[in-house]
Amino acid sequence: MAKLTKKQKEAASKIEKNKLYSLKDAAALLKVVASAKFDESVDIAVRLGVDPRKANQMVRGVVTLPHGTGKDVKVLALVTPDKEAEAREAGADHVGLDDYLQKIKDGWTDVDVIITMPAVMGKLGPLGRILGPRGLMPNPKTGTVTMDVAKAVQEVKAGKIDFKVDKTGIVHAGIGKVSFGAEQIVDNAHEIIQTLIKLKPTAAKGTYIKGIHLTSTMSPAIALDPKAV
């Protein structure tokens, strides 16, 4: 395990071991312990009482963060020529179809989100082995396969993110930057937690929200009290 730097040790010393913080206190503390010279990303990890191996306990969805992610999301719109102007006006960074499909086949994946149309999905099938592992495959459930391309692009640019429970039962999501105000971090975290609660599978038994941790790129994790969020 890598040794902690002096700054990381100082940060860790400010977080009480075995203490469960309220969301408000955790957000304020996170801004204190963040020590990197760059604007660190803020992430949340929510451990759910589900068995993701069972289809009826899979948790996935989308949420629009009230204050966005703080990240400049790069969007590729794979659309037919009649939709290109619409996609560009909405703010897509890359717009086209066959040229970009070839670029992806050649290994290019320098985007954060791909938005496409139902008629184009057939062409994307063979690229699943490239896009799937990178979380870039468009999906109707997350609103990235749609005829309303402009709306989809605008929502992603405004802070709409999709999430999915991993095989260990944890949902990870980026919810902002350390430069955000503490209240903005609280609002964004609260939004995703409430969305997860609404998505609780009926097959999930026992405690649903088992644990929540807030962290920044370089800081130790801060444990939250699930009852105080």
UniProtKB/Swiss-Prot annotation:
<keyword id="KW-0678">Repressor</keyword>
<keyword id="KW-0699">rRNA-binding</keyword>
<dbReference type="GO" id="GO:0000049">
    <property type="term" value="F:tRNA binding"/>
</dbReference>
<protein>
    <recommendedName>
        <fullName>Large ribosomal subunit protein uL1</fullName>
    </recommendedName>
</protein>
<dbReference type="Pfam" id="PF00687">
    <property type="entry name" value="Ribosomal_L1"/>
</dbReference>
<dbReference type="InterPro" id="IPR023674">
    <property type="entry name" value="Ribosomal_uL1-like"/>
</dbReference>
<keyword id="KW-0689">Ribosomal protein</keyword>
<keyword id="KW-0810">Translation regulation</keyword>
<keyword id="KW-0820">tRNA-binding</keyword>
<comment type="function">
    <text>Binds directly to 23S rRNA. The L1 stalk is quite mobile in the ribosome, and is involved in E site tRNA release.</text>
</comment>
<comment type="subunit">
    <text>Part of the 50S ribosomal subunit.</text>
</comment>
<dbReference type="InterPro" id="IPR023673">
    <property type="entry name" value="Ribosomal_uL1_CS"/>
</dbReference>
<dbReference type="InterPro" id="IPR016095">
    <property type="entry name" value="Ribosomal_uL1_3-a/b-sand"/>
</dbReference>
<comment type="similarity">
    <text>Belongs to the universal ribosomal protein uL1 family.</text>
</comment>
<dbReference type="InterPro" id="IPR005878">
    <property type="entry name" value="Ribosom_uL1_bac-type"/>
</dbReference>
<dbReference type="GO" id="GO:0006417">
    <property type="term" value="P:regulation of translation"/>
</dbReference>
<dbReference type="GO" id="GO:0003735">
    <property type="term" value="F:structural constituent of ribosome"/>
</dbReference>
<dbReference type="GO" id="GO:0015934">
    <property type="term" value="C:large ribosomal subunit"/>
</dbReference>
<dbReference type="InterPro" id="IPR028364">
    <property type="entry name" value="Ribosomal_uL1/biogenesis"/>
</dbReference>
<dbReference type="GO" id="GO:0006412">
    <property type="term" value="P:translation"/>
</dbReference>
<keyword id="KW-0687">Ribonucleoprotein</keyword>
<dbReference type="GO" id="GO:0019843">
    <property type="term" value="F:rRNA binding"/>
</dbReference>
<dbReference type="InterPro" id="IPR002143">
    <property type="entry name" value="Ribosomal_uL1"/>
</dbReference>
<keyword id="KW-0694">RNA-binding</keyword>
<comment type="function">
    <text>Protein L1 is also a translational repressor protein, it controls the translation of the L11 operon by binding to its mRNA.</text>
</comment>
